[in-house]
């Protein structure tokens, strides 16, 4: 008896990748016109539109006259859309944005009449263990995955409580579009289905479709012909939802960890460090847009300010368009990422303008609002046209401009006389607790050096919690709370990169070049913040490291500035701990997850030789935070860390120049086209920012709030 195969027609639609968005949209119009015609004529029973809504919205923006037909087909359960707005990367998108992705996607899908949803992540580069939990929040109890599944996982399994299907052979199947005889197609499918059957029971799931691919007009006839030739299988065109119904009792195997195994599928982990500028912009936009959203809700409740919900949704759509995996992962052509940068600029414009306009609307001249659910103690930086005395605030710079109270008041127009001094201050906030209504509180108090715990020389900076000192070309860190001393703790190292946008490609013989300290001096002196400027040299690279420390803080803040003139290289900062690193704690979807590592694993000794393999790495994604052995790092858009023996490394820059290098030593099969992308080399000015300190990972949110303060203020 033949096994039943439920096949569903689909297309995987990257809005932009090896072609620009508008170029792909023109292709989308052709593909979807064809699909709608086939659905309306009854030549195909249904079409699953990639688990997202943005592509359909892109189509209807050009062809609004097709909306009635689309609605009809959705109501007839022939066309399935959503639940997501875009197919974002799960490790480079935070939990707030991921929820917004579902919120916006479901809102639109339901407005179009769609009622059936599953978390469809067929091409995502691995899967966060937190995604099933978020799906549950939105009433979704099914998911489809592929990349990152270890070999032990069968076709059907429970992924953190969600009924999940593992696409054993992936989503990409274009055999029905190939120039082959029906006999050749049947032979291929027999072998293909045999592999799926090894991990399935009586019913198999077969995706039919591929990236940006339309449906063959005679697909039903082809399947009918193929069925006559298949020995062990009978293919039925239907939908993923019918498959889930047929196998509803098969979900016995449980797996509750993240899906990042690359033994059988590529997870392309080099994407976490490709085009770091995109990641930095993404982190900044995600932070500020969330802050603006919280503040506009607060303003509506407390001050009856205008609602900006529609503006916030528009900004999140722009941000989510950039978080689609071929966007945020940096593995598209240069023109695509230039457009990404424009969208990021738009999001920043919206977020900053909203915050400042709402501040003007409140009518408050002096206010501090803590929008987090945690008490805040720390230093904030703010601009003001008011010349405060040094007893109130610590001034750190002066420029000229127009006050926000004029710029963001729609009843005022700036004139030449409004162009006046603008001062940048540091202010200390002490034990600012969020009230139930997040209400207005008093002005913070300033500090003076005589009241400060900061101490410094040209080669040392410290407070009551932490000390950094430089001697004999090495940086020593001291945790003054525990008394632990870490000699030669911070180093910079540079490696060759023979890879591409998808994977770092190590040179077998490359041991890396270590940076050397060439100078150290006091950069800034103050009672609230002091800073050193330390210069490093690595070959031809000169790094300027601004190292700042705030009064009473546990965190040293680093701002690394350099002019990158090198190509095809990997630049990292190393932190040399006392013990081999076997476990890390890192941020994932705004929660902390634990990962285990083999500290002795060496990538250069394990490069693949057989076709179709991707090297295992000791790198992992992070969103803003990683910790181990009581040491913590908070970054501003640096999303990749690595473990090597007793060393934790953070990637500052990965310069590469090709989308997919067919000679990449880390991967024996191409992952995309070999298109040259010179802008991925990131030649020119680069800035990397992170903070380090000693604390238990249980206090990770406190560290996050110091670097990403949930504070709105106006002086």
Sequence positions of predicted segments:
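C-terminal (or distal) subdomains of carbohydrate-active enzymes
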Residues: 131-134, 155, 177-191, 231, ...
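N-terminal catalytic cores of secreted or lumenal carbohydrate-active enzymes
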Residues: 1-96, 100, 108-110, 137-140, ...
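Alpha-helical scaffold elements lining the catalytic groove of polysaccharide deacetylases
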Residues: 89-109, 170-196, 511, 530
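CE4/NodB-like, metal-dependent polysaccharide N-deacetylase domain
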Residues: 99-137, 190-205
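Conserved short loop/turn motifs at secondary-structure junctions
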Residues: 52-56, 87-90, 117-127, 208-213, ...
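Short, solvent-exposed turn/loop segments enriched in Gly/Ser/Thr/Pro and often Arg
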Residues: 48-57, 84-87, 119-128, 146-151, ...
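Surface-exposed loop and adjacent secondary-structure segments within mature catalytic domains
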Residues: 69-76, 128-176
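Catalytic grooves of carbohydrate-active enzymes
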Residues: 7-23, 165-363, 371, 430, ...
